[in-house]
């Protein structure tokens, strides 16, 4: 899941992955940098979790938030070794990843931290905890995922807010009526693209 999440953000050009959790270590599952050099920490939770995940990711943010550029550069070097990536100093790799005209200065790295918890869309306790800390001003967010079984294969999706809290979409059914289909079968798609829910006209 960490691989897929990292690939999702990298494809969008939003983040640069610099670290992935080592087995049996008290570490975030994934660390990345944004365009401004700020650190983004991901904690992935499978199914509904027991305990306080938000406090756990705060501990990670406290620990990693104190790391210097040189600490991050060392972590990135180990990440490159592990995944057989070309060796490059972090600030130069960051410049290339985001297409910057010049590399950031050392002091511009890790000035701010953002915590992201990735969890099941049905875990209402976790969603509530994240919403609470966000309301207190913490830079924390929740990314929901949902797992599907199609045939003999499992699929999962990450999706954006607003999101529902049901494990399976079939638990909440909806019906779309296209009363204009006989006149213009493509008009419904134009309405979707324009965020139009209802269109009325005189007969």
Question: What kind of feature is each model-predicted range?
Answer:
Residues 1-203:
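Charged, terminal alpha-helix-loop-beta segments
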């Amino acid at each position: 899941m960490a691989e897929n999440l990292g690939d999702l953000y990298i494809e969008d050009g939003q983040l640069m992955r610099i670290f992935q959790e080592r087995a049996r270590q008290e570490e975030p599952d994934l660390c990345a940098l944004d365009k401004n050099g700020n650190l983004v920490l991901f904690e992935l939770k499978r199914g509904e979790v027991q305990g306080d995940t938000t406090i756990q990711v705060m501990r990670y943010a406290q620990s990693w938030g104190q790391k210097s550029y040189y600490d991050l550069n060392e972590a990135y070097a180990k990440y490159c070794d592990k995944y057989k990536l070309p060796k490059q100093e972090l600030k130069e790799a960051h410049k290339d990843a985001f297409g910057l005209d010049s590399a950031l200065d050392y002091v511009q790295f890790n000035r701010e931290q953002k915590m992201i918890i990735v969890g099941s869309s049905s875990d209402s306790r976790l969603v509530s905890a994240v919403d609470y800390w966000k309301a207190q001003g913490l830079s924390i967010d929740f990314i929901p995922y949902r797992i599907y079984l199609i045939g003999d294969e499992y699929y999962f999706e990450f999706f954006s807010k607003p999101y529902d809290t049901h494990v399976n979409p079939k638990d909440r059914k909806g019906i779309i009526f296209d009363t204009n289909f006989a006149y213009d079968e493509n008009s419904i798609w134009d309405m979707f693209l324009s965020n139009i829910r209802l269109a009325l006209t005189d007969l």
